[in-house]
Amino acid sequence: QVLFFDTLRQRANNMLSHEKAGMPPVLAFKYELVADAASFEPASNYQLLKILEVGDICLDDCLDPDKPPVIIIDPRAGHGPGIGGFKADSEVGIALHEGYPVYFVVFTPDPMPGQTLPDVIAGLRQFVDLISEQHDGRAPVLYGNCQGGWAAALLAADCEGLAGPVVMNGSP
């Protein structure tokens, strides 16, 4: 019992530390903020990150300019990346290893006041437009996991002709 309660204590301490730090994304990759949908109209609590490095390996020399960008949308349940971005062998790591420029959609724990699903899709569409512009009009691959998969499907329908292939993993 002592070990069980000590584990719960450590977990709570980790969560409190994470909250004090402002609940930053817990990606296992270095990144920079590309866009924050909180500043869009309509606003949502989603952000777009560009993955810059894997460990100490800079990506400038290993990205293939002929490959389309990849936008990964992870599940909306909880906070932080799921299968997509917390290990080098994740979707992010594998796409980077293959030379694709990778972007990752994250979100803050609380939605914007009055936020709706159409607001989220509108923000995601602006992310697609922005990334397409930054990559000479190339349509990004949309990669969605679980709830992120149905968001990717809705987004692809809204971005007809602007988005590339859609990969839906474990999506309802």
Residue ranges and their predicted role:
Residues 154-158:
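Active-site signature of alpha/beta-hydrolase-fold catalytic machinery across serine-
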